[in-house]
Amino acid sequence: MDSLIAALSAGQTYRSDWNKNALPTTAQVAGQWYDLSTGAGNPMMNSIIGSSANLAHQAITETTSITAASGALGGSIAGTVFTDTTHGSGRFTVGMALSGTGVVAGTYITSLGTGTGANAGGTYNVNISQTVTSQTITGTAVAGGLPHGGDVGALNKHLLNASAFSSATTTAPAIMMLYDMLACYTITSVTTTGAQSFTGQAAWARYADGSGVRAFLVPSVVMGAGSPTVQLSYTNSASVAGRLTPAAPSLPVINTTAPVGSIAYAGTGVGKYGPFLPMMAGDAGIKSVQSINFSATMTSGVMNLVICKPLAYMPITTVGVASERDFVNMLPSMPRIYDGACLHWAMYAGAATPVNSSFMGHIDTAWA
């Protein structure tokens, strides 16, 4: 406690206010989990999800960015429609910032048009109306994490307080979960069945031993009509390989036409879990992932396996009333925030939540 008081006295503290919107086109269903990192607001949308190569390991920190280099060799913007006529490399995703000669600063993709978010052409809707003639247009994806005070080197940073609330109708009850996003694997091969191996594996930059690390699936492009089961092969935090998502009582079942931002298998009933993919009995975390197996085609869409470390939970019990947590005096207390942490919120909808509902709050951190 003395070191905490000294840190506060020395100004080694940071307050970060946030405001995130829920799904922009689809109401949130009661009984399901949603990843608010894919929503607009402050911090900005996480467009890293869905941007990397198929099945490839993408490490994530608060400053991670991915550039679709020469993404559109023949790209143009008319009004609020960006057209990728002659595609170069990489893929365009919702939330990705666009740049090029004459492109207005701050332009980003708000939604898909005829473009699919895959390595192909098509149209995408943008936030600023403008006219840009055919040229090379580049897209840059960012992680959009909640600021927490920057790197502190040899010092230890901890979460002191947090709050969350919403004034939108029927946004309560809800449960908010703060997590650190460690890595992501974009899965564009959603019509492939059987085990698909991940590539470019590397240790998690934070929580390298895997203790407490979990995984969930979230679409970055709305999924098609398929509803397969899913099984993850992983190595646990005790370095035991060959662990599998348990088949009993049931493997997780992907929701048909799962929308962007939804935890793809969350809900109520057989095969519904949330927010995380179940682990085998006795496992305390995920050290690495080896493959993923879908039992049937999902027809279309882009799925993403997100690796994360959950840090804190808090309930929102009443619309317009803030939920607050004092992590200094609660046990277990003061979750550590590592350098490079990419903090995001997930939400469990206890009631049908209207389209584009706003959630807001803050966190306080300190380091000593």
Which residue ranges define each predicted feature?
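Extended, low-complexity, turn-rich repeat/linker tracts enriched in Gly/Pro/Ser/Thr and Asp/Glu
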Residues: 149, 166-169, 220-227, 298-301, ...
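Extended assembly-interface regions of large multimeric machines
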Residues: 1-67, 141-219
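Hydrophobic beta-strand segments within beta-rich accessory/binding domains
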Residues: 95-98, 214-221, 341-350
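C-terminal interaction-tip segments
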Residues: 1-14, 18-22, 240, 302-368
